Amino acid sequence: MGRVRKSDFGSIVLVLCCVLNSLLCNGGITSRYVRKLEATVDMPLDSDVFRVPCGYNAPQQVHITQGDVEGKAVIVSWVTQEAKGSNKVIYWKENSTKKHKAHGKTNTYKFYNYTSGFIHHCPIRNLEYDTKYYYVLGVGQTERKFWFFTPPEIGPDVPYTFGLIGDLGQSYDSNITLTHYENNPTKGQAVLFVGDISYADTYPDHDNRRWDSWGRFAERSTAYQPWIWTTGNHELDFAPEIGENRPFKPFTHRYRTPYRSSGSTEPFWYSIKRGPAYIIVLASYSAYGKYTPQYQWLEEEFPKVNRTETPWLIVLMHSPWYNSYDYHYMEGETMRVMYEAWFVKYKVDVVFAGHVHAYERSERVSNIAYNVVNGICTPVKDQSAPVYITIGDGGNIEGLATKMTEPQPKYSAFREASFGHAIFSIKNRTHAHYGWHRNHDGYAVEGDRMWFYNRFWHPVDDSPSCNS
């Protein structure tokens, strides 16, 4: 055989690159990354991350969320364990000596043989945009001080960054995930949480002490930046065998959402605006069929979105519609059939889901051509459709989903069974950068990434496999 000339070698390389690029754009990527995992078990209740704050009846499990549609209010929530104590929040702007007071409401609940502490929820309204606020809870020796930033004023070219976490739980891997996110120099200004919080329901009798331990574990983040809550199957806590017949009982007592502000009738589906984004939260485990409250609300909600004001349209849900893992395969199908045509019509930019304990990103696809007789039931590329991202890889006790359907479907652009978190950084009305971070990588490493082009302002092809 003769020697290969340099020109021939260059041509071969070019051809191989073109072939590889073609394969990636049509078949997607299944990562073969080898994971180093801690034990997939929950941390014991005496772990440092669950430590109760010092002092009698000190406020604990502090968390905040957005308190209205526009982003000028927050809801501060906390628990006092021994007694009701004060339901007051003192707050003030940075570099200001003028302090304000807000008073909240307190509730308790019982779940089988568990009785909760005193759960406080206090709305703080009429805040200024783009401002740092300090706030204090408790009295005397048990006062605890925290802070948060309000979002910038709503507008199309305001930069804003979201963190993304799902299915977190309270295992050793959960701790790695939250620590990795908290220490990420590019971490979000708010967290979009796609459901499955404490996994208390995996314990006998849904041991609600695990709701308390999770609240203390996550406080290092939830007390300082708003977490936007989505409900998952592990928030249902429906246990008629022990006399607990009310779904979502612990969640609805412990966590608040601004659902009334957006015209919703339940706290499980609602919408908010934050900077340049319009965020719609849907409930995979509440009724969503035609004529249900959630269906009617969403039908009226999409036309309200003003893309000249909030160009980025983001949807959160728990159960993914496009999932190529064996776990929970096709579970989101009935909801997809009900709502997907609206997602395409209104040009949703991205959908974030959890439930599957792994990571996956889709191409822009839709599957709305099917009817009972035409047999057209295969997803197709659709530049008016959203990218679907499954980020249920927070690290919970149930472990990773490692079994995938083979061959990899064409709608799947990238998938990997690893724990991690993601960052969605909106730059302006046309561009946003997305990156997924494995737990065991350095912060500069993005295990997956994509530049998003806004579907309303810049609807050019941003096929993930070809542009990541």
Swiss-Prot record:
Expressed in roots, stems, leaves, flowers and siliques. Its cofactor is Fe cation; Zn(2+). Fe cation binds at D167, D196, Y199, H357. InterPro entries: Calcineurin-like_PHP_ApaH (IPR004843), Metallo-depent_PP-like (IPR029052), MPP_PAP (IPR041792), PPA-like (IPR039331), Purple_acid_Pase-like_N (IPR008963), Purple_acid_Pase_N (IPR015914), Purple_acid_PPase_C_dom (IPR025733). Induction: By phosphate deprivation, mostly isoform 2. One of its GO terms (molecular function) is acid phosphatase activity. It catalyses: a phosphate monoester + H2O = an alcohol + phosphate. One of its GO terms (cellular component) is plant-type cell wall. It is an enzyme of class 3 (hydrolase). Its EC number is 3.1.3.2. Zn(2+) binds at D196, N233, H318, H355. The keyword Disulfide bond applies. Substrate binds at N233, H355, V356, H357. Belongs to the metallophosphoesterase superfamily. Purple acid phosphatase family. This is Purple acid phosphatase 10. The gene is PAP10.
